[in-house]
A protein has these predicted regions:
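Structural signal for interior beta-strand "rungs" in well-ordered beta-sheet cores
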Residues: 59, 63-64, 69-154
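Terminal amphipathic alpha-helical/low-complexity segments used for targeting or macromolecular assembly
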Residues: 1-79, 83-85
Length: 154
């Protein structure tokens, strides 16, 4: 890609959304436009089954910002998407009860979103990651194989 990305992100080629790191000056530059980046990615690929079709996922409309509440253990067999919520979750991901996901959010393949975790919007998660129980994540990019242990704030 370039010296900067090669130096700070040596495995960037394996990250599905590596284009967001092209032509950046500082490592945090993509975070400045993360909302727009996620919405662009979702607009380019809105494939996947509807989130509403998955038993055990409830769309919470009682809040000011709509979200998904996980009511039981779920392992997704295929991608799911909600254009209304601006959320996409890839197949192989495990969702545990009481997790809450607000959009915009993209969650890659084969992740574990553990009990009580709170993805609070503007979240881009790579593949094979773990969001530990009672961990809150917002305005963040988690590359592949990141493990955010329990009781964290990211």
């Amino acid at each position: 890609m370039n010296f900067f990305s090669d130096t700070y992100f040596p495995q960037l080629d394996n990250f599905k959304h590596n284009d967001i790191f092209q032509n950046i000056k500082e490592v945090w530059d993509p975070l400045k436009d993360l909302n727009k980046i996620i919405l662009r990615i979702l607009a380019e690929d809105n494939s996947g089954g509807p989130i509403e079709s998955i038993s055990g996922l409830r769309i919470d409309t009682n809040r000011l910002i709509k979200s998904i509440v996980v009511e039981r253990w779920i392992k997704l067999k295929a991608p799911i998407t909600s254009q209304a919520l601006n959320i996409r979750i890839e197949g192989g991901t495990v969702l545990e009860p009481t997790a809450i996901i607000k959009g915009p959010a993209i969650i890659g393949e084969n992740n574990e979103i553990r009990q009580g975790s709170y993805l609070r919007g503007n979240v881009l998660v790579g593949n094979n990651c773990v969001i530990g129980h009672c961990t809150e994540v917002k305005n963040s990019i988690l590359m592949n194989h990141v493990e955010a242990g329990h009781f964290n704030y990211i």
